[in-house]
A protein has these predicted regions:
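Conserved beta-strand signature within the Rossmann-like core of class I S-adenosyl-L-methionine
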Residues: 128-136
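Surface-exposed loop/turn segments and immediately adjacent short secondary-structure elements
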Residues: 140
């Protein structure tokens, strides 16, 4: 019997997207991962902020995927979804997780939640050949529904975006759908 989960509780009041195996996934999420699938370099892939692991289903099946999230409950969910033999999930903080070398690191809608996001991007760059990042930008208030993001302002200001670009990464800004620079 499949374990049942309270999705609203796991989403932490719209703080994260959570989809279980077999759920339909929002087009916005799907678009991000389809973009990633076409831009993955190599076979060894790390995803920071993997949530329930739903993004794995859109990525090439021949990759060695590691998903990382700070929320132990969501990692339990990811492990129970049985996404695939090549998918491993870990509960850890990116600030202290011992990073290996990866071909590609994915961080979708994560950097803006970190107090030291720019430092983390610098750290990630040292451990991969290809870094795929998306950040929210110009989303209308309430785009994700009433009370989205606990009414926090997560949209990145121009200075932060310029700082990210100065780190010479491949960055996507999420306007209604990803626009890549």
């Amino acid at each position: 019997m499949t374990k049942q989960y309270n999705i609203r509780e796991l989403e932490n009041n719209f703080e994260r997207a959570v989809f279980l195996k077999g759920d339909s996934v929002h087009a916005r999420e799907t678009t991000r991962y389809l973009w990633a699938r076409n831009n993955i370099f190599g076979k060894k892939v790390l995803e920071i902020g993997c949530s329930s692991g739903y993004g794995y289903q859109f990525l090439p099946k021949d990759i060695d995927y590691t998903g990382l999230d700070y929320d132990s409950k969501i990692i339990e969910v990811a492990k129970n979804q049985q996404w695939g033999d090549n998918a491993k999930f870990y509960h850890a903080d990116i600030n202290t997780f011992p990073l290996d070398q990866y071909d590609t690191i994915i961080a979708f809608e994560v950097i803006e939640h970190l107090d030291n996001g720019l430092e983390i991007v610098e750290k990630l760059k040292k451990h991969c050949k290809w870094l795929l990042i998306t950040v929210p930008h110009n989303e209308p208030k309430g785009f994700w529904g009433v009370g989205s993001y606990n009414d926090q302002e997560l949209l990145l200001d121009k200075g932060y975006l310029i700082a990210l670009l100065n780190l010479e990464i491949f960055l996507c800004l999420n306007d209604a759908f990803a626009k890549c620079i």
